[in-house]
């Protein structure tokens, strides 16, 4: 889970930044492993702030929230709101089924253009570093 990743980064001396919706705060689910907490009203505000402050979005294995963030960034890029890209960090093939779905949608003509212009894939840490370089 994201909390485990934040703890590992925090414990290693890395900076961890959390964009925290008020509902998460109200429910007492804010990670204790944040170097910086940026409060926001809701998930839409969270995505807007993350997009505003990011150069690229690296998607680690995650659930529905991560999928929401991936597709928000990719979809808004396809229609010209920004030129930011998503990198799926495909640790142990985690994103393989999503990649297969995207390939199928591409083949069926449901995605205009090449989705790889907006969503890139890194199957290893070396590939991730290369894409970020």
What spans do the regions from the language model cover?
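Anion (oxyanion) recognition and catalysis
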Residues: 6, 10
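Glycine-rich oxoanion-binding loops at beta->alpha junctions
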Residues: 19-54
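Active-site/ligand-binding-proximal alpha/beta "capping" segment
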Residues: 44-80, 87
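Short, acidic/small-residue loops that bind anionic groups at enzyme active sites
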Residues: 19-21, 60, 76-100, 113-115
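Short, aromatic/basic amphipathic alpha-helical patches
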Residues: 98-108
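Short, small-residue-biased leader/transition segments that mark boundaries at the very start
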Residues: 1-2
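A charged, well-structured terminal subsegment
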Residues: 52, 56, 107-133
